[in-house]
């Protein structure tokens, strides 16, 4: 109350009242994409066939590596800790090659995005490929866009139930095949298939197939565009990869505006008319449910189906194709300026067409090879190629023989009855070839050093002979002895050297020989 006892009234409004409160998440509006036809749609069919063919058929490819190695061309052998890719075999200690492949994939993604935008999202992303496949099934079972909208709005009937059960059944089969193909990369495919269907496979195989069946069905059939919009981080990241010379799917409003659904009537009335007849064909085919005419949007995956739809309309009305096209921001801005667009004036269709012929004027800018080959993309390509070349060189020069030595912790040394000092070592020798090998182990840099195997009673020798199994690691324990009078310090550095008897490979590892401090030469 104020001084006079009157109640004070406040001029304030509840900004978060029940009446105006907005939900945290926008409710999803179901999208019914129309079947598109054209160059980019055919290209997407081709990419889908290639990528799905590679995924489903690769586990069945055979590659002869000899009698001692698996003959599956691509295999992730978790039990034996090996990764096979045709003639390449990666061991656990060589995981840096896998890291190199991941770096190459990342740089390659940057390269593609900086040149042709989100082409990965629009053509080869697994989510896009499987959604395309699921949509093809939906269109085959329920019909094109109008038929699906009508079916969705219709009350439940026997016909609707049959179509829905058929569609979702096929989707589940696709999900099952997707999960089934995945596990075939981790074991011999024919053997695992037999064990799987005879219920003799490991429980993890059934669990993995079940999880991937469910995720494929949910992501590809039910969530679709929501995965790209809300779950995938790439739409947010790709903005940093684009510049004014990157190709993106663009609505060229410098020739499309002003829109008119009745162009002839508008022209007769003396109004300016652009090429866009506002038919919304570009919206009808979009799997993300956006209108490309609103400009660049986070949801756009640059699948270019709107280009096909618009080109078809332009053909029907006798206009040039390319109202929606791949374009760079620089080209777009230049053409907008040519059309007279500014902050205060709209585009003038008459400025971009020859008054006599009605064709587009020659001064318009179009995409050229300079949009792709520029300093930024060259740097990306050189980095990508450099990593690839370095990995190929490393693979071609790597040794197929490796050795490691671990000194015994307790006791560090033993004083023998003849006055010599003995140290124990755990030796691992890796035979990284798919054939048996015989190797010799020697000491380098240890004066008068001799060796014996811990599991034999043979006399000490300057070298030891070992037979290695193909593609395997041999572990053994050796005793190294030396005359302390020949050693200058309490710790002497030396090397274990291993050499194949055939002479084609050698390897060595560093070690230390210890003796007591009180021992005097």
Predicted regions and their residues:
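Short acidic, flexible loop segments centered on an aromatic residue
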Residues: 435-450
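Hydrophobic alpha-helical transmembrane segments in integral membrane proteins
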Residues: 389-413
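Intrinsically disordered, low-complexity Pro/Gly/Ser/Thr-rich segments with frequent PxxP/GP/PP motifs
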Residues: 453-485
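Cysteine-centered iron-sulfur cluster-binding motifs in ferredoxin-type domains/subunits
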Residues: 113-128, 220-235, 266-314
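Short, solvent-exposed loop/turn segments enriched in Ser/Thr/Gly
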Residues: 420-425, 474-475, 489-494
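Membrane-embedded alpha-helical bundles of multi-pass integral membrane proteins
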Residues: 2-259, 307-308, 324-383
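Short solvent-exposed strand-capping/beta-turn motif centered on an Asx-Ser/Thr pair
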Residues: 430-436, 485
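Terminal connector regions
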Residues: 482-521
């Amino acid at each position: 109350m104020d001084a006079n006892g009157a109640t004070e009234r406040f001029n304030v409004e509840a900004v978060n009242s029940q009446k105006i409160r907005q939900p945290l998440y926008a409710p999803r509006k179901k999208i019914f994409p129309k079947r598109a036809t054209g160059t980019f749609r055919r290209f997407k069919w081709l990419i889908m066939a290639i990528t799905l063919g590679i995924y489903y058929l690769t586990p069945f490819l055979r590659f002869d590596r000899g009698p001692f190695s698996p003959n599956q061309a691509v295999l992730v052998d978790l039990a034996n800790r090996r990764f096979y890719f045709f003639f390449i075999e990666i061991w656990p200690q060589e995981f840096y090659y896998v890291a190199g492949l991941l770096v190459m994939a990342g740089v390659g993604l940057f390269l593609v995005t900086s040149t042709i935008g989100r082409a990965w999202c629009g053509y080869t992303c697994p989510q896009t490929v499987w959604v395309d496949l699921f949509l093809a099934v939906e269109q085959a079972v329920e019909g094109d866009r109008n038929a699906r909208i009508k079916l969705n709005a219709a009350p439940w009937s026997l016909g609707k139930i049959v179509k829905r059960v058929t569609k979702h059944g096929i989707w589940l089969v696709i999900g099952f095949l997707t999960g089934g193909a995945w596990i075939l990369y981790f074991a011999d495919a024919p053997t695992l298939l037999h064990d799987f269907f005879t219920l003799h496979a490991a429980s993890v195989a059934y669990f993995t197939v079940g999880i991937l069946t469910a995720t494929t069905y949910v992501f590809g059939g039910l969530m679709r565009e929501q995965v790209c919009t809300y779950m995938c981080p790439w739409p947010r990241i790709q903005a940093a990869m684009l510049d004014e010379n990157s190709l993106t799917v663009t609505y060229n409003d410098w020739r499309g505006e002003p829109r008119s659904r009745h162009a002839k009537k508008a022209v007769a009335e003396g109004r300016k008319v652009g090429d866009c007849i506002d038919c919304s064909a570009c919206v009808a085919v979009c799997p993300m449910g956006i209108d490309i005419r609103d400009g660049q949007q986070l949801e756009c995956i640059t699948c270019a189906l709107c280009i096909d739809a618009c080109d078809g309309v332009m053909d029907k009305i006798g206009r040039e194709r390319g109202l929606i096209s791949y374009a760079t921001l620089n080209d777009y801005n230049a053409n907008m300026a040519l059309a007279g667009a500014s902050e205060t004036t709209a585009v003038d269709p008459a400025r971009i067409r020859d008054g006599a012929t009605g064709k587009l004027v020659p001064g318009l800018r179009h995409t050229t090879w300079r949009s792709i080959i520029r300093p930024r993309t060259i740097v990306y390509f050189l980095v990508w190629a450099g990593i690839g070349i370095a990995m190929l060189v490393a693979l071609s020069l790597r040794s197929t023989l490796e050795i490691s030595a671990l000194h015994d912790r307790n006791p560090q040394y033993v004083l023998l009855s003849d006055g010599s000092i003995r140290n124990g070592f755990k030796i691992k020798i890796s035979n990284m070839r798919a054939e048996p090998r015989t190797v010799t182990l020697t000491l380098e840099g240890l004066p008068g050093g001799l060796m014996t195997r811990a599991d034999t009673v043979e006399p000490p020798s300057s070298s030891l002979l070992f037979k290695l199994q193909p593609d395997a690691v041999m572990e053994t324990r050796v005793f190294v002895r030396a005359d302390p009078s020949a050693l200058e310090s309490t710790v002497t550095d030396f090397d274990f050297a291993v050499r194949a008897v055939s002479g084609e490979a050698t390897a060595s590892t560093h070690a230390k020989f210890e003796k007591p401090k009180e021992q005097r030469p």
